[in-house]
Swiss-Prot record:
Subcellular localization, as worded in the UniProt entry: Cytoplasm
Xref: Gene3D superfamilies: 2.40.50.1010, 3.30.70.2200, 3.90.600.20
Family the UniProt entry places it in: Belongs to the TiaS family.
Protein name per UniProt: tRNA(Ile2) 2-agmatinylcytidine synthetase TiaS
HAMAP family with a match to the protein in the record: tRNA_Ile2_agm2C_synt (MF_01892)
GO cellular component terms listed in the entry, alphabetical order: cytoplasm
Range of residues in the leader sequence: none
DNA-binding region, residue intervals: 273-347
GO BP annotations, alphabetical order: tRNA wobble cytosine modification
Lineage: Archaea, Methanobacteriati, Methanobacteriota, Methanomada group, Methanococci
Annotated gene: tiaS
Length: 423
């Protein structure tokens, strides 16, 4: 007799369903059949994967009972039935996969599975690679269409701490596709009452609710936090449309597990990095409302970009100057190669000097006569040579520490500043 894991991924689409909904229904049915089930996991993989259906997240379920062969067959049949019923097969980009792995094989291959988890966080993994790996660790898989879902299904099974939690509340079927009615004031109150133990509930800068998805899927809202008990209390504070059911998932949301420290010379596209270096080109605005600057760490240089959707965060980036020593957290785009910034940590600020535009004779205002041609005082009319102008230090409108994008622009995996010392 053995215990087992089930992994599922890539069943949803931008228009229909949600893999977590299948997991929730599956757990309900398994419990109804008398099986014991651990808290399910919702695990996000590399956010730079281009063919993801929505958030590139797989789910994993751990059956805690000792199972006979007939039990395993029953569980597999229930799983397959639900996946086939609640998958959007019509969507070209939806390619479901299911993985089954006995707990004995899981324990025997724990180190290999940990390495696989890191790989799906940092790199782009092929279906062929996942197939071979599943067979290598003694698992089984079922592919539909291209079967990309087996990649994330095994990734969810393989995941390791750190974890956070997400409570997902689901809508009644007759409400699917209709506008979600969630009271904004209640979300704000819930956020303030549960801070810092819940996160990404509301974007105060852009006055936007963050707990509700924008797609016509079964999810009514999702509340993220670091304490499952607090999530239960938070759910009851939300006013508006009432959910039909809910489930708490163990997740890797808000953990920064997709990022790793790298030297610029070693950086490659479609991975997540933390890079320490100095600003070597001052930030500038480019087409589209984005802000870009260049960073050097002694091994190379790389462009770092704050995109337009990061809104006010771009104003922080604009205040950086050449010489500032910072850490940049983000993912690497392919063309042109550069870092999409998720947050920065300012470690040391360069002193900033400007020309003293006051007349040294009378204190009046100086006016430039031309490029490096000197200055003339508007008040006493005296002329001052260009190289006679004093440089004075001005206070920087920045402090050392972390600065982050607003919640509405944050990736699932990115750690909010409020969690830096909590997880």
């Amino acid at each position: 007799m053995v215990m087992m894991f089930i992994g599922i991924d890539d069943t949803d689409s931008p228009n229909k369903y949600c893999t977590t909904y299948i997991a929730t229904l599956l757990i309900e049915e398994l419990k109804g059949c008398g099986y014991s089930v651990d808290m399910p996991k919702l695990i996000r993989m590399n956010p730079m994967v281009k063919y993801k259906t929505r958030g590139n997240g797989g789910v994993a379920i751990h059956i805690l009972d000792e199972l006979y062969s007939k039990d395993k067959e029953e569980i597999k049949n229930i799983t397959i039935s639900l996946v086939e019923k609640y998958t959007d097969f019509e969507c070209e980009n939806t390619n479901p996969g299911i993985v089954f792995l006995d707990e004995a094989k899981y324990k025997e291959n724990r180190e290999k599975l940990t390495n696989y988890y890191k790989k799906v966080l940092y790199d782009i993994v092929s279906v062929d690679y996942a197939e071979k790996f599943i067979l290598k660790v003694g698992g089984e898989f079922i592919k539909y269409k291209l079967g990309r879902g087996i990649i994330g299904a095994l990734g969810a099974i393989s995941s390791t701490p750190p974890y956070t939690y997400e409570l997902l509340a689901y809508r009644k079927k007759e409400m699917w596709g209709k506008k979600r009615e969630i009271d904004e004031k209640s979300v704000i109150e819930m956020d303030k009452e549960t801070f810092p133990y819940t996160f990404d509930n509301y974007d105060y800068e852009n006055e936007k609710i963050l707990i509700a998805p924008n797609t016509p899927c079964p999810v009514l809202f999702g509340i993220r936090g670091i304490d499952a008990e607090i999530l239960l209390k938070a759910m009851h504070k939300i006013e508006g449309e009432k959910p039909e059911r809910f489930m708490i998932f163990k997740t890797n949301h808000g953990t920064d597990v997709h990022l790793r420290k790298m030297n610029i010379k070693d950086i490659y596209p479609n991975t997540g990095v933390i890079v320490y270096g100095r600003v070597v080109e001052e930030p500038r605005d480019i087409e589209g409302g984005h802000v870009i600057f260049k960073l050097s760490d002694g091994t190379g240089e790389i462009d770092c970009m704050a995109y337009e959707p990061t809104k006010g965060f771009r104003d922080i980036i604009r205040k950086l100057i050449v010489g500032d020593y910072i850490a940049v957290y983000g993912t690497v785009r392919e063309k042109p190669l550069g870092i999409n910034i998720e947050k920065i940590k300012i470690l040391k600020l360069e002193k900033k000097f400007v020309k003293d535009k006051r007349c040294p004779y009378c204190g009046g205002t100086l006016k430039a006569k031309g490029k490096k041609a000197g200055y003339k005082c508007k008040k006493c009319k005296k002329t001052i040579a260009y190289d006679e102008i004093k440089m004075i230090e001005v206070e920087r409108d920045l402090k050392t520490g972390f600065y982050e994008v607003p919640g509405s622009a944050r990736r699932h995996l990115s750690k909010p500043i409020q969690l830096i010392d909590l997880i």
